[in-house]
Amino acid sequence: GEELCQEVSKMGITLPHPERTWFGEPEAKRRQEFLNQASEFELDSPFHQSPNETKAECLWRRYGEEAFELLEMIRQDFSLSEPLFPEAENLLCEIHLIAKKEMIVSLADLLRRRTRLALLFHHDFLKNSKNLKEAASIIFGKQTENQWSEYF
């Protein structure tokens, strides 16, 4: 919300009560606390496709307060700070959080709505991604093969 207010203000539009906290958006000091902690895990570098936003900023934008859970996962297993695959803008810890918090009904739901991977990568690339299949197994468990064959 704050970023939106800044952009709208740049257009010369005066906002009533721009200092108000947006619904659901944590205070700026919580964001800064997250960014400080995230830098300990080398999340202050950008994804290669998004040079204007660090991994930490991206995680905060996507998850808000829940991003602290991602840091805790990384604290317990640093390998979860790695991207799903080098070209992806989703970290392995996100897959674990998605599996824990969201009701993913299909592989299409995961690839189109939750991660946007289907919108960013060729179908065959995704189909042949071992890492993606492993991520799907975290979410779908015993239903992974059914989900995989249904989507691909």
Give short role names for the model-derived ranges.
Residues 1-152:
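C-terminal accessory subdomains/tails of enzymes that are appended
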